[in-house]
Amino acid sequence: MIKPKAAWAAAACLLLLLAGEIRSATTAVSATVASFCLMAVTSSAVILTVSNPATPGGVPANPTNSGTYAQYSSPVASGVTRRVTAAWATGNSAPTSCSLLLLATVPSGKGTSAGQITISTTAQNLVTGIGGCATGTTGTSGAQLTYTLSIGTITSLVANESKTATITLTLTDS
């Protein structure tokens, strides 16, 4: 007499043999990395004020502001790098006898600082050699931007003169 478990096992094997071959299906999966370059700054306003010197007869210090960061995401094709340029709009200027300077302090692996530049209407390299990277999204992630109002000669400063300039940072292929 055949035991019930053995009978069921034999029946299952017989059904598999009678059912024919096991069928399968395939799916082609296509994955593509889109080309994009995104950039933002963490602050929309920077204020630089020339204040009185600490002692009478002294020269005022050049005001600076390092509270803004440029954040970017940039996958690149093999052999391609990107850069960040900076310029101000036509008609913008610094106060009389002053220049607006900008320096980017770049985190490791996120490009190379071009050093301190003098802002003008001509776009200048601020960060170069940006490969595939994402700088992060927290308030202090990315390339730290230091704006400095450099005083040329104190004798040419105009008291109460105020200028507002729109600085455009552009992330583009090198």
Predicted features by range, described:
Residues 1-10:
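Bacterial N-terminal signal peptides that target proteins for export
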